[in-house]
Amino acid sequence: MLDMKLLRDRTEFVRERLATRNAGDEARVSEVLALDESRRAALAEAEQLKARRNSTSKEIGGLIGQKRLDEAESKKAEVRALGDRITELDKTAAQAEESRDSLLLMIPNLPHASVALGKDAADNPEIRVHGQKASFEFTPYNHVELCERLKLIDFARGAKLSGSGFLLYTGWGARLERALINFLLDLHQREHGYTEVAPPYIVGEHCMIGVGQFPKFRDQAYAVQEGLDTSTMGKLYLLPTAEAPVANIHREEILAEKQLPVCYCAYSPCFRAEAGAAGLGTRGMIRVHQFDKVELIKVVHPDQGYEELEKMVHNAETVLQRLGLHYRVINLCTGDMGFAAAKTYDIEVWAPGQGTYLEVSSCSNCEDYQSRRMNLRFKRESDGLNLFPHLLNGSGTALARLFVALVETHQQADGSIRVPEPLQPYLGADVIPLAS
């Protein structure tokens, strides 16, 4: 969440930065400040009354010693009344704080000054392009046709099992998916210096709040509604991304400065209830409710936040370069950024069968927005102060769309798919053949 002190001290700056998102969130600032002022006023009055109660209580003993019992009883009544008022003020302050913090959770992060101003994806500036679009001397197939011809995915049976938006990988398709997962994890762990973790696939509500998924995007999550432990029903969720558990690993902790940066990579399936647009994207693999992803998370010193973001983007780019895929990197404009992000780069891979770019990685620096929600801090060595680190997240990468781009790019005239060299040891083959 945003720093309350920043809202008080630089109110117009906060409003101006929020306004660049074009979502109307700046309108919430006045309400947050009003609740904050109500809380502070109640606490200030309560402190004054506590001091008065203490001094009055001391007077009572002297009055009793002087046998001025009527006056002592009057003072006792005054102390009781002060106590009742203090209790009332404490309750008012607590209610105002709860309402203020609930509103704060609904306000997104402030875009970094380097982020381009814009309304939507059409305003996202292109940063760089790698490689050339695949060209063919034959009429290429799209991924749905390839998956059906090579029996990589059984779309019909996936839908039969779980409904639309769910995939059943089969044969070479299942093996290719597993090969990609292992390749990605090994690359990030061995070459890029990330520590691999294997998180739970069900997370608590506090984890979703910590990364900014909740409360705003609660309707896009799959909640666990039944089970043996009735106390958790409706409070546990299938993870929408491994960011939810992995970024929260050190919540409520104070790390040593020398521990930074902390870098994790994790594989997980991801579950999202959001609906896709009708058409090939819905029928195929472009928009699905469950997909695999390797997530990258960094906890870094604020001074290194943006340097580490550039490194993370290059880590994700390496995946596509090794697999021989054409892609571009774009910088999301203020109106297209995610809720918790201060700056985001998207990496979009070219899918020749779709004739378009597909997002396979989104890398963001959330600055201290998430660490404040998690109360994750580090102790600065120079003065012992506890500070909030920057939290970075990125896809390294998402698998479904990577799968699409790979099979469409590396298809061959005979209908087979050439396996990129880095995947061959994992797959045990250099070609995925036509199904018999």
Predicted segments — roles?
Residues 129-436:
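TRNA-recognition modules of translation machinery and tRNA-sensing kinases, especially anticodon-binding
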Residues 1-134, 152, 156:
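N-terminal alpha-helical targeting/anchoring segments
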